[in-house]
Swiss-Prot record:
One of its GO terms (molecular function) is small ribosomal subunit rRNA binding. InterPro entries: Ribosomal_bS20, Ribosomal_bS20_sf. It comes from Rubrobacter xylanophilus (strain DSM 9941 / JCM 11954 / NBRC 16129 / PRD-1). Residues 1-22 are annotated as: Disordered. This is Small ribosomal subunit protein bS20. Residues 9-22 have a biased composition (Basic residues). GO terms for biological process: translation. The keyword Ribosomal protein applies. One of its GO terms (cellular component) is small ribosomal subunit. Belongs to the bacterial ribosomal protein bS20 family. Binds directly to 16S ribosomal RNA. Keywords: Ribonucleoprotein, Ribosomal protein, RNA-binding, rRNA-binding.
Amino acid sequence: MPAPTKRERQNRKRFERNRSVRTRLRNLSKKFYRALDAGDLESARSVRDEAQKAYDKAAGKGIIHRNKASRKLSRFDRALAGRG
């Protein structure tokens, strides 16, 4: 098998896998801010914990940069502190 073909196949596979993780992160972020806007602090805390795990895992696998994960989680904390 020619190397470029294999590389294309690997890239496509990684892209699909990483895209699903990034989509999940975006959805968790939206879910957090929706809960916060609705005034449901308990739900927002729960989603924040779920998001922390997901962001840390994605950063550990190199899907997103670790500084981006840290920045997002810090903003979640500040938003919660401002409301709570």
